[in-house]
Amino acid sequence: MRILGTLIMSFYVHKSTYFGHDSIKYLLTRSCDIQHSIEGPAFSEFRRGSMPGRESVLASYAMLVAGYMTTVFGPEIGELVSVDPATGAELGRVAETPPEAVAAAVERGRAAFIGWRKTGFSERQRAVMSAREVILAEIDEIAGLISAESGKPVAEAIAMEIAPVLDLMQWIGRNAERMLKPRRIGIGLFSLMGRSSKVIYHPLGVIGIIPAWNYPFSIPLGEAVMAIMAGNTVVLKPSEMTPLVGLKIGEVFEKAGFPQDVVQVVSGAGETGAALVRAAPDKMIFTGSTATGKKIMAAAAESLTPVVLELGGKDPMIVFDDANVELAASAAVWGAFCNSGQNCAAVERLYVQEGIADNLTKRIIEKTLELKQGPGTHEEVSIAAMSSERQIRIVERHVDDFREAGATIETGGRRVPRGVGLSDLYFEPTVITGATNDMRPMREETFGPLLPICTFQTEEEAVALANDSEYGLTASVWTSDYAKARRVARQIEAGTVCINEVLYTHGIGQTPWGGFKNSGLGRTHGYEGLMELVKPQHIHTNRFAILPDAWWMPYSPTAVDLFRKMSRTFASGSLLKTVALLPMLVKRTRELLKK
């Protein structure tokens, strides 16, 4: 076998494996002599997916490290089983990456960084645009894979995962150089002394990325592209629930011709992620629960690895009585039920002013009942399967809690009975009225298709209700009074507040993404997100490097008198007062020259 890399991945393929994915077929038909590494049935039979029964075949090919492959980790290391939430069918199996191999990947990323950081922005842009072309050429295959592995409707796979990333790639490719251009700093009166300052931006090095399972393509790919354009290399640990999408991301970069080890994908569950943090990359970007984010931050602190954390949300939507009711109802339905509610920015608390509460609730229920539910691969489906049994049980518990606390389940509130060929991970979109902030489900993140509705009377009450949460990721304000909207928005404790919009701004790559309070630290996307991926260096220059500075040693009564007057002068910023100090500066300089 022709060795092209130094790390490997084993893949166990069964008759249930989804051979329709080019991401699998491509890896199985690499030009290297992989046939000699196959045990069991003939390789041609393996490639056709025509193996009889459930006999597993070990395909010896690499952990995807920018597409380069070698020999195999044995089956004893553990494997991830990829399952289609819609049907419960197994899609494939991916070997977990051993901890020592994760550390080695970070070291290879550091070696690749030496060369990658020297590339010009135009070269990086060409590489990113090539990756963009790969995605465009395979958009339907990628959407199908995302839908199959995450359970979401194919419409959302395209609209909320692929399209936003394509836009981000174009924006960051065209604008990274401008945003990272060296910047001069005004230094006030010091400039009169022949001094100047500027800031230049250096890439950090290796960026470790651990994304969530709910947006397995757009979250990690967007973060990786921004890191790459800033001159960094990337080690990505996809969610253990969506390992095939993670491999597809690696394949995109490989097909685009990225240099080896600039982007590496390490597959695995929690221990693999922990190993990535222990390997001390130059920054960690994590998307997931607040509890796990705190653990990652604590582990990263051992090596002083900085972190960006995008964590939980319990996002409020405030609808005033002068809002467009029809528009607000449609927005609430989409904002609450998109991706079966599995969004950190989903509408999980709807506060509506009493005057329109009945009308708005009625329209929300009517619109909810119109939604079609089923496998995400069906293009007419709006509500697909949830991701896992664990997640759907949280939703069931919250429905029970609402009911026991006295709220009313207006529609939905239960699992959909198992259909032929389908899993039991479908939960009806649920509208709840009579909710109050003291109910437990109003304080915990649900991450499911529940829309609890509360009422309020005054603007001040609405703000207080919205801020009564440990989370602060996003919020939205709905009103025809834009002065009121802006006034309320400024008071809401959230990283993003939309006015007459909801949820979608993660898909605008130019805008920063991140939260307040327990919703996380730092930002991804936008200028602010780009600044998380570089380290600023301040360069200060003295163009009149002839005479000593007046504040140098040795000190004297003359020096102290001068310093006292300089403090008052510089604090005022007055040019005239500074000029008046010139005689004392000359005297002090002569004093130093005599030493």
Regions found by a protein language model. Give the residues of each.
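N-terminal Rossmann-like NAD(P)+-binding subdomain of aldehyde/semialdehyde dehydrogenases
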Residues: 36, 46, 51-195, 387, ...
